[in-house]
């Protein structure tokens, strides 16, 4: 487990923001997949302010999502809606660089549309960087324990939250694993126990998608704050 521990969640998101600056200055478009959750909100707020908002060449960055809930962008549950409110409304970014899951659409229709967009824009299925979170149950994106097909050859899948039954669309495990780089951004004391378990137990003996999903030909890393890493 390749872990980097930061003093606070803010330090972790500052590091990611600094890397956005570097990625944005490459001489080709860069495809980044974002995550929902509380720590990414901190990242989006940080990116929307100086110095990052000015230093980043937004025209070069294309944004996607690991998953989203099937709700309209105005719904507080929408991962895309959060980024729009906290980041996109505050910067100049071309509309065509934003590749959202359209949560207001009928799920099967949207699944097909989203897969077509993915195939057209990233024909080899290789993302430059996928930023993921992890729930206390070990899920990542909307890939939940005991209900994820790790061999699904599709690009995306309709998923149902095991408790609320809420419908989402998620990238598949296989698509995520093709990325050049996967960063799990995990913060807070509530994640300490499961991180310890992932560090000390072979992934094949665990039900957690976050323990199993790793970049096949790239880098997999865990950005943690001190609270999350306290048992490691």
Predicted regions: what is each one?
Residues 56-131:
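Ligand-binding beta-strand-loop-alpha-helix segment within the catalytic cores
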Residues 34-39, 132-136, 187:
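Glycine-rich beta-strand-to-loop/alpha-helix junction loops that act as flexible
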Residues 1-32:
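N-terminal glycine-/serine-/threonine-rich phosphate-binding loop
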Residues 180-232:
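ATP/nucleoside-binding phosphotransfer catalytic cores, i.e., glycine-rich phosphate-binding loops
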Residues 130-174:
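Class I SAM-dependent methyltransferase SAM-binding "motif I" and its flanking Rossmann-like core
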Residues 46-56, 81, 145-153, 201:
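A glycine- and small-aliphatic-rich helix-loop capping segment at beta-alpha/alpha-beta transitions
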Residues 26-51:
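Glycine-rich N-terminal segment of FAD-binding domains in flavoprotein oxidoreductases
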Residues 111-112, 141-146, 194-198:
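A short secondary-structure junction signal
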């Amino acid at each position: 487990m390749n872990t980097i521990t930061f003093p606070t969640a803010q330090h972790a998101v500052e590091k990611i923001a600094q890397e956005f600056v570097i990625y944005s200055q490459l001489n080709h478009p860069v495809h980044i997949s974002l995550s929902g959750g509380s720590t990414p909100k901190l990242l989006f707020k940080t990116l929307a302010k100086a110095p990052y908002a000015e230093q980043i060449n937004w025209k070069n960055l294309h944004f996607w999502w690991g998953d989203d809930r099937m709700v309209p962008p105005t719904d507080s549950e929408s991962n895309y809606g959060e980024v729009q409110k906290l980041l996109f409304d505050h910067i100049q970014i071309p509309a065509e660089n934003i590749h959202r899951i359209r949560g207001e659409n009928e799920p099967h229709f949207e699944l097909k549309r989203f897969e077509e967009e993915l195939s057209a824009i990233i024909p080899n299925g290789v993302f430059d960087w996928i930023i993921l979170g992890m729930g206390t149950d070990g899920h990542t994106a909307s890939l939940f324990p005991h209900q994820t097909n790790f061999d699904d050859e599709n690009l995306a899948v309709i998923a149902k939250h095991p408790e609320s039954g809420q419908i989402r669309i998620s990238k598949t495990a296989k698509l995520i694993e093709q990325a050049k780089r996967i960063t799990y951004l995990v913060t807070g004391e509530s994640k300490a126990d499961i991180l310890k378990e992932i560090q000390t137990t072979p992934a094949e003996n665990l039900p957690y998608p976050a323990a199993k999903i790793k970049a096949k030909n790239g880098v997999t890393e865990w950005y943690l704050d001190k609270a999350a890493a306290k048992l490691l």
